[in-house]
């Protein structure tokens, strides 16, 4: 009798103990990914980020290169460019005692002489007797010689058998540019005064005007 009671008490005590909860079972439709799948996904994301950063960096590099010269100059090329820049013409300049106007230099003689000797003097200076281009140039020359009460030989004479006024460069006088006053005959040469272009004997003594083209004056190394 006592033994039965003890057995019953032990049975009740065991059945009253709390039961451990088991984890909920997954439904058959749920897919549980293995751990290496998750690791592969993380690595893929990291690679994608690195790829995007690489593309951005490459784009910046390309833009930087495009802003630079395609070919870098060698030291020899740099020196050559400096030499060209230094030796480049800086201005147009006439010789001393010559006067510049437009693209010409003019020289006025100080002592009178015949037309032929005046022509030879200009040739010795590497120039020619004056060849008047237009009325504007004639006005400049009259201002240049203003105050000198003399006429000035120019490179124009009367030629036979053509019976024409010709410049020493063989071109014929344009009467719209100059009108000649005075007798026109053999051995006639032209001179300019403050108000006229005169026909005179080539053996007369006059001052004269030489002309030459402007030349480039270069500023070179060591000058």
Curated annotation (Swiss-Prot):
GO annotation, cellular component aspect: cell surface; external side of plasma membrane; plasma membrane
Q: Which cysteines are joined by disulfide bonds?
A: 122-210, 189-202
GO MF terms here are: carbohydrate binding; identical protein binding; protein homodimerization activity; signaling receptor activity
* Motif interval(s): LCK-binding motif: 31-34
- Keyword terms of this UniProt record: Disulfide bond, Lectin, Membrane, Receptor, Signal-anchor, Transmembrane, Transmembrane helix
Listed transmembrane segments: 46-66
Q: Which Gene3D superfamilies match?
A: Mannose-Binding Protein A, subunit A
Q: Where in the body, by tissue, does this protein show up?
A: Expressed in a subset of natural killer cells.
Q: Where is this motif: ITIM motif?
A: 5-10
Keyword Nucleotide-binding, does the record have it? no
GO BP, one annotated term: regulation of natural killer cell mediated cytotoxicity
Is Disulfide bond one of the keywords?
A: yes
Q: Provide the membrane topology annotation.
A: Single-pass type II membrane protein
Q: Where in the cell is it found?
A: Membrane
Q: Which ranges sit in the Extracellular compartment?
A: 67-223
- Where does the record place the C-type lectin domain? 101-211
Q: Which residues lie on this side of the membrane: Cytoplasmic?
A: 1-45
| Annotated function | Receptor for CLEC2D/OCIL. Ligand-binding contributes to inhibition of cytotoxic natural killer (NK) cells. May mediate MHC class I-independent 'missing-self' recognition of allografts, tumor cells and virus-infected cells.
Q: How does it assemble?
A: Homodimer; disulfide-linked. Interacts with tyrosine kinase LCK. Binds PTPN6/SHP-1 in a phosphorylation-dependent manner.
What is the UniProt domain comment for this protein? Contains 1 copy of a cytoplasmic motif that is referred to as the immunoreceptor tyrosine-based inhibitor motif (ITIM). The phosphorylated ITIM motif can bind the SH2 domain of several SH2-containing phosphatases leading to down-regulation of cell activation.
Mind telling me which PANTHER family this protein's record contains? KILLER CELL LECTIN-LIKE RECEPTOR SUBFAMILY B MEMBER 1
This chain belongs to the protein called Killer cell lectin-like receptor subfamily B member 1B allele B
- This protein's gene is called Klrb1b
């Amino acid at each position: 009798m006592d033994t039965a009671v003890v057995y019953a008490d032990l049975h009740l005590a065991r059945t009253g103990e709390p039961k451990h909860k088991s984890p909920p079972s997954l439904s058959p439709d749920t897919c549980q990914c293995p751990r290496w799948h998750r690791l592969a996904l993380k690595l893929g994301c990291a690679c994608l980020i690195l790829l995007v950063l690489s593309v951005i960096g490459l784009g910046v590099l390309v833009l930087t290169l495009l802003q630079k010269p395609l070919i870098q100059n060698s030291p020899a090329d740099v020196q050559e460019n400096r030499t060209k820049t230094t030796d480049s013409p800086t201005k147009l300049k006439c010789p001393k005692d010559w006067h510049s106007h437009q693209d010409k230099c003019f020289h006025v003689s100080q002592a009178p002489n015949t037309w032929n000797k005046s022509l030879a003097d200009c040739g010795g200076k590497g120039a020619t007797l004056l060849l008047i281009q237009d009325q504007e140039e004639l006005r400049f020359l009259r201002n240049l010689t203003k105050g000198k009460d003399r006429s000035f030989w120019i490179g124009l004479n009367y030629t036979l058998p053509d019976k024409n006024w010709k410049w020493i460069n063989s071109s014929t006088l344009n009467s719209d540019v100059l009108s000649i006053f005075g007798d026109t005959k053999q051995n006639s040469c032209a001179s300019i005064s403050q108000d006229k272009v005169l026909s005179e004997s080539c053996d007369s003594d006059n001052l004269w005007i030489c002309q030459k083209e402007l030349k480039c004056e270069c500023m070179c190394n060591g000058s």
